[in-house]
Amino acid sequence: MTPPVTGSSVTESTPTKAKSGGCGCDTSTTVEMDEKLQERIAKHPCYSEEAHHHYARMHVAVAPACNIQCNYCNRKYDCANESRPGVVSELLTPEEAAHKVLVIAGKIPQMTVLGIAGPGDPLANPEKTFRTFELIADKAPDIKLCLSTNGLMLPEYVDRIKQLNIDHVTITLNTIDPEIGAQIYSWVHYKRRRYRGAEGARILLEKQMEGLQALREADILCKVNSVMIPGINDQHLVEVNKMIREQGAFLHNIMPLISAPEHGTHFGLTGQRGPSQKELKSVQDQCSGNMKMMRHCRQCRADAVGLLGEDRSQEFTKDKFLEMAPEYDFDKRQEVHEGIEKFRVELKVAKEKVLAGKEKTANNPKILVAIATKGGGLVNQHFGHAKEFQVYEVDGSEVSFVSHRKVDHYCQGGYGEEATFDNIVKTIADCKAVLVSKIGESPKEKLLQAGIQTVEAYDVIEKVALEFYEQWNKG
């Protein structure tokens, strides 16, 4: 599984760079995790940025009901064409969900995590949620179990979560100020009563804090998701970040608001915009010195299947997976995982070799590059086939993951669509180069005209990025 090394090629024409510019951002201030914690998340693609290059996850949609109404959410139970939280193609019973997991565990042996994240709240549907976990824990003990919740009912179920060996819990926590919460939540339903405004937000916050503390006491890892909403909580998220760290969260995922009008959410229908890439990164960077930040979130559907950035859910719709025999094979899965871990060791050695001797220099400007990758920590995807680009920051001595940016794939039916290409250019306009396995002459020339160079390679991301940077830095 050693990554092939074939070198790289850079477009011959090199636009002059501004030495004092760079990307105007900084991801260098990071918080490292201790070795024991890294071992616990080593195969969890949502909790580990490195693992998401190699391991897959799946969500099962067994929890339709929700006990709060967020202004950014509109749950849909029969939707196949939207990619966002709260959306599924179909609901499942716990038994159907368990069957689906066993089928996919055989078809995709690198799938290591089963999560329940909706389309409502798992803890507003406790019987279905815990029955599903019980079935999977019994039949597929090597699969990690995790759930995502708004936290309202979390204090009541931490003991049950611990009993089932659910080691990873995500809480969506958008504010620690009830007045701000009143602008985010339409209502909160608690103990058979519906609360609105700041009162509802206060109750939710109290239960979130209680739940977070209870998770810490139970030694259950907690990630906090926060939706960044410009003009409402964007300037407040640094305070949220400090508070959740004090309460025991180990990872913070600040996500952009999705507010397209066609999704039918309150914010979408009232014109509330989401943050720009620059605004999102600025807030993430402000928080990065306080605790570990998650930057590789894909804001998945509640029935997502596959690697992050790869949704294979339509391959396993109910009419299909119910006709498939479970192929779960513990020994085969372990063999696949051993191969992945061997490759990860080789990849780590390759990265260390690339970075060896690279001294950090304050004078080196930082730049962004876009990567076309199918996973594995490699530049290994054709430009025209990419449905997203991973963006990295490079400064000559370090290569740091920044974000992913979704695009429509350029080559459809063998031809490139002009509107799609224009959108790609807009999406990666702040990047100095796009690193791909292959690209046609026409899009290469058009990118160069837009000030974006191309590098063709099939190699370790860090190696290709640093080689480009060295050439770029020479002017």
From Swiss-Prot:
Looking up InterPro entries in the UniProt record yields: Aldolase_TIM, Di-Nase_FeMo-co_biosynth, DiNase_FeMo-co_biosyn_sf, MoaA_NifB_PqqE_Fe-S-bd_CS, Nase_CF_NifB, NifB_C, rSAM
Ranges for domain Radical SAM core come to: 52-303
EC number(s) of the enzyme?
A: 4.-.-.-
Q: Where does [4Fe-4S] cluster 1 bind?
A: C66, C70, C73
Example GO BP: nitrogen fixation
Q: Which residues bind S-adenosyl-L-methionine?
A: Y72, G120, T172
The regions listed as transmembrane in this protein's record are none
Coiled-coil features, chain-numbered ranges: none
Q: Does the keyword Zinc-finger apply?
A: no
Pfam families under this entry? Nitro_FeMo-Co, Radical_SAM
* Ranges of biased composition (kind: Polar residues): 1-17
Binding of [4Fe-4S] cluster 2 occurs at C297, C300
Needed cofactors: [4Fe-4S] cluster
- UniProt superkingdom: Bacteria
Please tell me which top-level EC class this enzyme sits in.
Answer: lyase
Stretches the record annotates as Disordered: 1-25
Quote the cofactor binding remark: Binds 3 [4Fe-4S] clusters per monomer. One cluster is coordinated with 3 cysteines and an exchangeable S-adenosyl-L-methionine. The two others probably act as substrate.
Q: What molecular functions are annotated in GO for this chain? A: 4 iron, 4 sulfur cluster binding; lyase activity; metal ion binding
Outline what the protein does: Involved in the biosynthesis of the iron-molybdenum cofactor (FeMo-co or M-cluster) found in the dinitrogenase enzyme of the nitrogenase complex in nitrogen-fixing microorganisms. NifB catalyzes the crucial step of radical SAM-dependent carbide insertion that occurs concomitant with the insertion of a 9th sulfur and the rearrangement/coupling of two [4Fe-4S] clusters into a [8Fe-9S-C] cluster, the precursor to the M-cluster.
Give the family this protein belongs to, as stated in its UniProt record: Belongs to the radical SAM superfamily. NifB family.
**Annotated protein name in UniProt:** FeMo cofactor biosynthesis protein NifB
Q: Which gene encodes it?
A: nifB
